[in-house]
Each structure stands twice: as structure tokens, then as C-alpha cells.
């Protein structure tokens, strides 16, 4: 399947469900408590992150889509923290505050990248009337491309049918991340996304692939769904639609570090992609790739559009690496259409050393994409002398293209990159070393079209020239 990334920035998604605050305490562990056989953690860092339905909204916003989050919280410090994080992420949050019940908070204590304990602070919101939340949702559906019901069984979605019927009456697709064994309450939804254990809790244990497909299709028919997506951990995910062949996608994760919030990522990417106009199979393929990214991160995390885009290109074996200027121009136009910021740097890069790697990592963090333009062999000889380059152009490009921080590598025949800057027009021009802006070649060009010029430090005591001289001296000895 050829996967296409949609224009996420053109979509708007409304999320309603059980919002939570994920709280992390990080610290060092070096001894066992004298009071009980448990480790003592010296807490060094505190962090709050949106969780539950709020994490779904955060994932949607990270992709570039407009996100709205609605749910029930307490009237407490945790609710204030959650609202502040929604605002800082550019998410419109409209919470129904309860006077006496607490905001659902999950506190995790982590040391040496391991979760030692989780403590939950919560009371069910099942007794809270839903009418106020329904009115809030109705007021936010105008212009929405999808509605997500993020059900964690905490009571905010006591009656999902009210939200499903409201959205479907406006021809807005409804995606449900379900909870519990009663899927009847999700009847009429566009898509539900149970994991395997949730699915089998409803249909019974499946002893074969054929049985899973058969029972899944029966569920699609009985609940009047358009589709059912069963997420199956290391076995990938399976999409089932009436009258269509099943679509099975293998798991993408190279290394599983933390599965916290992976289900949120799946439904977030699905909703944002469908809202942006993707076909269902395409949206599922994107969600599968995103899940593979997020389980490699620690804690409740999100996936950005550039991350997803790079992963798609790696999956399809295209879109990165060494390119001609003409090919690169097309790639940059496409990246800009997806709202990505382009960083550009240049140099000879004759012998790649630790200073180069650290510098390129810094440069990459300034934007979404990094272009490295290198001098041709003839250009290097003019600048460095007839004994250079040590490595020919093809080898220098191959090494740079293999670095994780580098998206694209190209070359130029001139002694300066000025003509290349006029063609590519990067957002940020970066140079390594202790330079003033006026000493960076091409700064007038970049600032002339509204770009930015930055100078970054190299790692101390790292120099290609010094390395070459040392090799020559060692040979003389």
C-alpha cells in the first residue's frame, strides 16, 4: 500500500471522554528503605502530562489538526494543570467542573527509566448528569471532520448514544475507543477500536485468524458499524469492514519501551486522518506506523506530523537521503505544504567526526527537517588545497545521509551556497562555529525573504583539518 500523508492542518476534531492528568515523579534510587523492603526514590523532577481523552486531543494537535477537548474534571489544582497544558498546546478545552469529585490523576514514580509504582486519585463521574456535556459538544461540532469518544469507563460517557446520534445527524464520523464488554452502547458509530482482549471479552476467545475475522464482521453487522479495528499489540492490527476483505497490518515497533497511551495515539491519528480526507485503509496504515513510534517513547507521549512523515518515508524507502537540487526542491515544496520548518547547513564534511554529529543534532532540533549541502570535490580542493578532499563526494554524501538527524543531502559546485539558498529558501540557515550573523555566507539572502540565521557551537577540540594533520604526522613517525 502506498501511504499518503494528508493535510492534517486542514482538519478539526472534537474529542469527548474521560480526561485525566498523568503525573510523573522522576528520581534516583540507590538504597532500600529501612521501614519496608521498597526502594527509596530521591525525587528530582516533576512533570504533568495530559492523559486519557486529553492525551487523544494532544496527539491530534501534535499532528497539526485543530483539536477540541470536552470532559469532566474536579475543581482542583489538577484540573488547572490540565487546562494549562491544553492551552499551551493550542487545544480548545471546555471542561465541566464538579465541585466535590477530584480530577482523575495517575501518579507514576520512575527511576532509571523504570516505573516503580502508580497511584490513582479518582472517583467515578458516572453519577454526574450528562446533559451539560452534551450541550458543550453540540456547540463544538460545527466544522468538525470527526468526533472521538474516548471511553475509559470513568463515567463521562455514561450514554455514548447521545453523542453518536448527535454527530451522525450532521454526517460527522464517530470514532470510539471502547471500554468494557458492552459494545451495544456504541451502536451506529463509524469505527470502534478495541484491543484484542477487549474484543474477545465481547465475542469470546478466537482460536484462529479466520475466527477473529468472522466474529468481527458479525459484530460490524450487529452494531451497524462501518468498520472495526482490532489492535493486537505485537501482532499488529486488523481492519474489518462489511463487504470488504480484511486488512491486516503487522506491528511497526522496532523496540517497545512503554505502551502507555498507545491506544490514544491510534485513535488520534485515525480521527485526524479521516477528518483530513484520508480513506479508511490509509488512515489505519498511518495509525499503525504512529503506534510503532509512540511505544518507543517513555510515558504518555504523542507523535508529530514530521515524525510520522519520516516514518512513512522510511517504510516506503523513499523521500530521504541524497538528492539532486531538482529532487530536493520538490521534496521541500511538499514538506512546506505540510507545515514543516526547513533547516539548512552547508560545508565540506570531509571526515565526519563527533563535532559534526553533535552540531547536526543541534541543527535538526531547530526545525522539522534538516538539509545538508556539501561542497563538490572541485570546490573542496579550491577551498582546502589540492590534497583535499580525503573522501570523494559520493562517500561524504553516503555518510551524512546515514545520520539520523539528516533528512536530505545535496551538493553544489560553487565555493559558497548562495545560489542554492536562493533556490531552496530554507526557513533557518545554520552555521557551526563562533560567527556573528554577518559572517555567515548567505545571511542577506535568507533574511531577505524572511528567514532566520543561527550560529551553533562545535564540540571542542574537533576539527577535520586537525585530524588530517595528526594522521600525516603519525605517518611521518
Curated annotation (Swiss-Prot):
The answer to keyword Kinase applying to this record is yes
- Region annotation Cytidylyltransferase: residue ranges? 344-477
The protein's matches in PROSITE patterns, at most eight in alphabetical order, are given as: PFKB_KINASES_1 (PS00583)
Active site, UniProt feature? 264
EC no. given is 2.7.1.167, 2.7.7.70
Q: Which InterPro entries match?
A: Bifunc_HldE, Carboh/pur_kinase_PfkB_CS, Cyt_trans-like, PfkB_dom, RfaE_dom_I, RfaE_dom_II, Ribokinase-like, Rossmann-like_a/b/a_fold
Per UniProt, which keywords does this protein have?
ATP-binding, Carbohydrate metabolism, Kinase, Multifunctional enzyme, Nucleotide-binding, Nucleotidyltransferase, Transferase
Catalytic reaction(s) noted: D-glycero-beta-D-manno-heptose 7-phosphate + ATP = D-glycero-beta-D-manno-heptose 1,7-bisphosphate + ADP + H(+); D-glycero-beta-D-manno-heptose 1-phosphate + ATP + H(+) = ADP-D-glycero-beta-D-manno-heptose + diphosphate
Q: To which pathway does this protein belong?
A: Nucleotide-sugar biosynthesis; ADP-L-glycero-beta-D-manno-heptose biosynthesis; ADP-L-glycero-beta-D-manno-heptose from D-glycero-beta-D-manno-heptose 7-phosphate: step 1/4; Nucleotide-sugar biosynthesis; ADP-L-glycero-beta-D-manno-heptose biosynthesis; ADP-L-glycero-beta-D-manno-heptose from D-glycero-beta-D-manno-heptose 7-phosphate: step 3/4
Cross-referenced SUPFAM superfamilies, in alphabetical order?
Nucleotidylyl transferase, Ribokinase-like
GO biological process: one example: ADP-L-glycero-beta-D-manno-heptose biosynthetic process
Lineage, top-rank taxon, reads Bacteria
UniProt binding sites for ATP:
195-198
GO MF annotations in UniProt: ATP binding; heptose 7-phosphate kinase activity; heptose-1-phosphate adenylyltransferase activity; phosphotransferase activity, alcohol group as acceptor
EC supergroup of this enzyme: transferase
- CC per GO annotation: cytosol
Q: What residue spans carry the region label Ribokinase?
A: 1-318
The task this protein performs is described as: Catalyzes the ADP transfer from ATP to D-glycero-beta-D-manno-heptose 1-phosphate, yielding ADP-D-glycero-beta-D-manno-heptose.
Subunit structure, briefly? Homodimer.
State the family it belongs to: In the N-terminal section; belongs to the carbohydrate kinase PfkB family.
Protein name per UniProt:
Bifunctional protein HldE
Amino acid at each position: 500500500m502506498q501511504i499518503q500523508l494528508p493535510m492534517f492542518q486542514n482538519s478539526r476534531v472534537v474529542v469527548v471522554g474521560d480526561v485525566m492528568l498523568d503525573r510523573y515523579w522522576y528520581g534516583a534510587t540507590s538504597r532500600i528503605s529501612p521501614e519496608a523492603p521498597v526502594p527509596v526514590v530521591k525525587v528530582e523532577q516533576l512533570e504533568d502530562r495530559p492523559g486519557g481523552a486529553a492525551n487523544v486531543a494532544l496527539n491530534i494537535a501534535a499532528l497539526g489538526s485543530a483539536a477540541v477537548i470536552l470532559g469532566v474534571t474536579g475543581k482542583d489544582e489538577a484540573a488547572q494543570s490540565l487546562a494549562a497544558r491544553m492551552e499551551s498546546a493550542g487545544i480548545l478545552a471546555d471542561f465541566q467542573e464538579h465541585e466535590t469529585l477530584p480530577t482523575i490523576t495517575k501518579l507514576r514514580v520512575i527511576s532509571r527509566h523504570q516505573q516503580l509504582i502508580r497511584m490513582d486519585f479518582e472517583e467515578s463521574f458516572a453519577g454526574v448528569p450528562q446533559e451539560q456535556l452534551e450541550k458543550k459538544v453540540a456547540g463544538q461540532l460545527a466544522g468538525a471532520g470527526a468526533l472521538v469518544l474516548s471511553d475509559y469507563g470513568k463515567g463521562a460517557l455514561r450514554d455514548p448514544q447521545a453523542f453518536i446520534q448527535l454527530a451522525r445527524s450532521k454526517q460527522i464520523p464517530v470514532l470510539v475507543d471502547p471500554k468494557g464488554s458492552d459494545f451495544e452502547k456504541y451502536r451506529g458509530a463509524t469505527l470502534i477500536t478495541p484491543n484484542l482482549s477487549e474484543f474477545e471479552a465481547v465475542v469470546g476467545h478466537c482460536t484462529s485468524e479466520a475466527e477473529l475475522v468472522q466474529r468481527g464482521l458479525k459484530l460490524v453487522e450487529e452494531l451497524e458499524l462501518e468498520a472495526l479495528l482490532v489492535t493486537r499489540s505485537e501482532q499488529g492490527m486488523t481492519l474489518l469492514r462489511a463487504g470488504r476483505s480484511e486488512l491486516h497490518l503487522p506491528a511497526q515497533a522496532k523496540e517497545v519501551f512503554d505502551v502507555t497511551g498507545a491506544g490514544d495515539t491510534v485513535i488520534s491519528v485515525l480521527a485526524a486522518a479521516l477528518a483530513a480526507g484520508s480513506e479508511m485503509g490509509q488512515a489505519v496504515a498511518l495509525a499503525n506506523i504512529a503506534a510503532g513510534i509512540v511505544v518507543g517513547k517513555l510515558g504518555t507521549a504523542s507523535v508529530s506530523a514530521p515524525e510520522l512523515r519520516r516514518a512513512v518515508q522510511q517504510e516506503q524507502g523513499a523521500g530521504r537521503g541524497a538528492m539532486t537540487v531538482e529532487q530536493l526542491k520538490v521534496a521541500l515544496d511538499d514538506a512546506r505544504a505540510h507545515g514543516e520548518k526547513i533547516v539548512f547547513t552547508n560545508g565540506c564534511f570531509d571526515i565526519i567526526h563527533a563535532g559534526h554529529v553533535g552540531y547536526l543534532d543541534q541543527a535538526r532540533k531547530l526545525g522539522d527537517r534538516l538539509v545538508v549541502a556539501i561542497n563538490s570535490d572541485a570546490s573542496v580542493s579550491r577551498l582546502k588545497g589540492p590534497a583535499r578532499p580525503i573522501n570523494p563526494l559520493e562517500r561524504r554524501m553516503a555518510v551524512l545521509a546515514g545520520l539520523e538527524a539528516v533528512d536530505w543531502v545535496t551538493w553544489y559546485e560553487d565555493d559558497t551556497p548562495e545560489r542554492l539558498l536562493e533556490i531552496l529558501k530554507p526557513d533557518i540557515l545554520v552555521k557551526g562555529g563562533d560567527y556573528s550573523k554577518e559572517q555567515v555566507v548567505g545571511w542577506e539572502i535568507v533574511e531577505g525573504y524572511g528567514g532566520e540565521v543561527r550560529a551553533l557551537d562545535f564540540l571542542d577540540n574537533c576539527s577535520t583539518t586537525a585530524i588530517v594533520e595528526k594522521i600525516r604526522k603519525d605517518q611521518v613517525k
